[in-house]
Amino acid sequence: MDAETLLLETEESMLKAVDFAKQEFSGVRTGKASPGLVENLDVHVSSYGSVMKLKGLAVISTPEPRLILIQPFDPSTVHDIGRAINESKLNLNPLVEGRSIRLPIPALTEERRKDLVKLVKSQAEEARVRVRGARKAAMDSAKKLKAENIVTEDGQRDLETQIQKLTDKYVKEIDELVAVKEKDIMTI
């Protein structure tokens, strides 16, 4: 492995941590309806005998600010989808209406909003830990490259500086995502 490969692999690992944070945040409820709230929900489809993501089973739309409309491609999956929503941690009550499901999004209480902000912050910390883990692995690899005489001492220092810059960049990106999500949650 050379220095360039190390930096590319490190950046890829850090990007995965940011993507993890984005995906986790999309599942956190804000006061308004969003397809991202339910699209990654795991649904056990009894007629197929497998577990699938909701976005692979239905069209998810938001016809009103506080309503999600779920229209399954296969009408036989309506009740499986309703059950998955009931069993999720979203605290939502799906209304099965023939071939579709209406999912009203109630307004959040102040206490619930604060709990959701705490949840988002803990998810963000988990993502930051992943970024720092990628940094530690990269720093160890940089030391190994120096020990194997692939890079000079100055090269190692430059590499460590670049790794730290990547770390700072992705931690800042996670912090910005948290700020946006917190604002979304606290907006009534």
UniProtKB/Swiss-Prot annotation:
Coiled coil: none annotated. Its main location: cytoplasm. One of its GO terms (biological process) is translational termination. It is found in: Cytoplasm. Keywords: Cytoplasm, Protein biosynthesis. The keyword Cell inner membrane does not apply. One of its GO terms (molecular function) is ribosomal large subunit binding. One of its GO terms (cellular component) is cytoplasm. The keyword Cytoplasm applies. HAMAP family: RRF. Belongs to the RRF family. Responsible for the release of ribosomes from messenger RNA at the termination of protein biosynthesis. May increase the efficiency of translation by recycling ribosomes from one round of translation to another. This is Ribosome-recycling factor. It comes from Akkermansia muciniphila (strain ATCC BAA-835 / DSM 22959 / JCM 33894 / BCRC 81048 / CCUG 64013 / CIP 107961 / Muc). The gene is frr.
